[in-house]
Amino acid sequence: MSRSTKKGPYVDEKLFEKMQKLNKTGDRKVVKTWARASVITPEFVGHTIAIHNGKKFFPIFISEQMVGHKLGEFAPTRTFKGHGGMTKQETSLV
């Protein structure tokens, strides 16, 4: 179930304030954030945001196509190592 349209999209207040401040000054420095649930707004476009994935920060350049998506969608939290294959011991027995 999606968020109520009456409430509007969730945007982390501190992150939004930082982006507005950067837009006023014209700075393009990387902003670190843990707010993965925050929705990308048009104010974020053109900036680089380092999104935490639980272990480290992934720098993501925000483009216009990303508006409306959540920050966490662009920083994967899980790494797939592949399904179990044959080990050295198993191959020597065959």
Curated annotation (Swiss-Prot):
Key words, A-Z: Ribonucleoprotein, Ribosomal protein, RNA-binding, rRNA-binding
Biological-process GO terms, alphabetical: ribosomal small subunit assembly; translation
SUPFAM superfamilies in the record: Ribosomal protein S19
Family annotation (PROSITE patterns): RIBOSOMAL_S19 (PS00323)
Gene3D superfamilies reported in the protein's UniProt record: 30s Ribosomal Protein S19, Chain A (3.30.860.10)
GO molecular function: rRNA binding; structural constituent of ribosome
GO cellular component: cytoplasm; small ribosomal subunit
PANTHER family: RIBOSOMAL PROTEIN S19P FAMILY MEMBER (PTHR11880), SMALL RIBOSOMAL SUBUNIT PROTEIN US19M (PTHR11880:SF8)
Cited HAMAP family: Ribosomal_uS19
Role played: Protein S19 forms a complex with S13 that binds strongly to the 16S ribosomal RNA.
Family designation: Belongs to the universal ribosomal protein uS19 family.
Protein name in UniProt: Small ribosomal subunit protein uS19
